[in-house]
Amino acid sequence: VASSIVRYMRYREIDPETPLLFGVGNVTELIDADSIGINAIMACIAEEIGVDLLFTTEASAKTRGSVKELKVASYMAKAAKLKKTPPKDLGLNLLVLKEKTKISAEEPSGKIIEGKKSDEFIRDPKGDFRIWIWRDKIICKHDKATIVGKTAKEIVDTVIALNLVSRLDHAAYLGRELMKAEIALKLKKNYMQDEELNFGTYK
C-alpha cells in the first residue's frame, strides 16, 4: 500500500492535471479489518495527493457499506482541506463503535446486590420463538405467528399484543435476543440465536 501511495504522489508531482482514480476497494478487500476506518484514512490520503475519483466494492460481507462509508469519508477529507484543519469536528464523522466523549455515569448508592446468572430453565407454556435475520429484517417465529420488523421494540410490543409470552424470564430472554439481532442488523453482522455477537478483539 505504501509503495503504491508513493507512486501516486510522484505521478501527481509530474502531472497535476490528469484525473486520477484511487482503487480503495483493493485495500479494504485485502485486509481483515473493519472497512470504515480504512475508507476514512484512504479518502484523506487521496485528498492530500489530489486524487479525483475513488473506487470501491462491496464484494464481501466485511466490506458491506463501503460505498456509503467512502462517500462520507470523502466529504470529511474535502471539508478538512478547505478548512485547513484535521478531519475532525466537521459536523459529520465515521464513528460507529466508539464515541468522542464519555458520558459521566451516576455512582450507585444504597444496597448493592451483585447480579448472578440463573441456570434454571422452565419452558414457557405459550411456546418458543426462533429468531434470525433475513433481507435486512428481524424474523421472530412462533407457532401462532411470524413477526417481522427492524427493531426489538416493535417486535416485542407485537409479541405482547398477541399474548404470545407468559413468563417474565421468557420475556426478558426475548428482549435480550431481539436487541442482539437489532444490533447485528445495524452493524451488518451475523446473528445466531443464543450465541454472542462477534466483536473480535473487543470480546
Label each PLM-derived region with a short phrase.
Residues P125-K203:
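Extended hydrophobic packing segments that form well-structured cores
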Residues S66-L70, T101-A105, R176-M179:
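A general structural signal for short secondary-structure boundary/capping elements
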Residues I5, I14, I31, I36-I41, ...:
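Weak global preference for isoleucine
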